[in-house]
Amino acid sequence: MATDELASKLSRRLQMEGEGGGEAPEQPGLNGAAAAAAAAGAPDETAEALGSADEELSAKLLRRADLNQGIGEPQSPSRRVFNPYTEFKEFSRKQIKDMEKMFKEYDAGRDGFIDLMELKLMMEKLGAPQTHLGLKNMIKEVDEDFDSKLSFREFLLIFRKAAAGELQEDSGLHVLARLSEIDVSTEGVKGAKSFFEAKVQAMNVSSRFEEEIKAEQEERKKQAEEMKQRKAAFKELQSTFK
């Protein structure tokens, strides 16, 4: 870092001057590079700037130590990076992509969240307008980090609860899931009668995901081939006019 390099140079200069005379008095309120700068006769502005940098670095190191020891503020679920395909295994890739498309459609602010006003517009477009209190209750039911808005992960929780039958039929979230036209029927391992049935169902889910990925790859190849053919046809058409 530039600060460390400057501090090292100033310390060497101070040491050389100290050999020829008395020690420079320590400046109150300064430490590290700032103290070295002040002792070497650097301008007050330089010493203060270095002191501020030292304090900022110390604060960051203390913050990191607190987090490592579990003292600091925990990271909220909505800010945590997650993989929807592994965390919400009860849904197919197509279902999750449909939910993501719907989420982005109503995330008017493009900030990765659906706030109260955006949820209000969503419910109105779905033909089921809600009261202000009703909207707040909808968010509250899945708001894990208490920030009064829906992250994509919390949005997926709505459909998880709907698929598991955990939503009251007259609740706003149940209405949202029903009117979204996203089929949330699942083929997961819930309700398996035995361990072996659960294993078989888990294997089926895994193979289903592989099939969906292969289908997506084939679709992309098909689109690329069609694009290639269109470009070739266009070039051939151009050549006829030359």
Swiss-Prot record:
Ranges of biased composition (kind: Low complexity): 32-42
Compartment annotation: Membrane raft
SMART domains named among the record's database cross-references: EFh (SM00054)
Gene this protein is translated from: EFHD2
Binding site for Ca(2+) 1: D107, D111, E118
Assembly with partners or alone: Interacts with CASP9; with inactive form.
PANTHER family referenced in this protein's UniProt entry, alphabetically: EF-HAND DOMAIN-CONTAINING PROTEIN D (PTHR13025), EF-HAND DOMAIN-CONTAINING PROTEIN D2 (PTHR13025:SF2)
Keywords linked to the UniProt accession: Acetylation, Calcium, Membrane, Metal-binding, Phosphoprotein, Repeat
Residues modified to N6-acetyllysine: K235
Modified residues (Phosphotyrosine): Y85
Primary role: May regulate B-cell receptor (BCR)-induced immature and primary B-cell apoptosis. Plays a role as negative regulator of the canonical NF-kappa-B-activating branch. Controls spontaneous apoptosis through the regulation of BCL2L1 abundance.
Residues that coordinate or bind Ca(2+) 2: D143, D145, D147, K149, E154
Modified residues (Phosphoserine): S11, S76, S78
InterPro entries, alphabetized: AIF-1_EF_pair, EF-hand-dom_pair, EF_hand_dom, EFHD1/2
Bridged cysteine pairs (disulfide): none
Residue stretches making up the EF-hand domain: 94-129, 130-165
The protein's name in its UniProt record: EF-hand domain-containing protein D2
MF-aspect GO terms: calcium ion binding
Positions carrying N-acetylalanine: A2
Pfam family, one: AIF-1
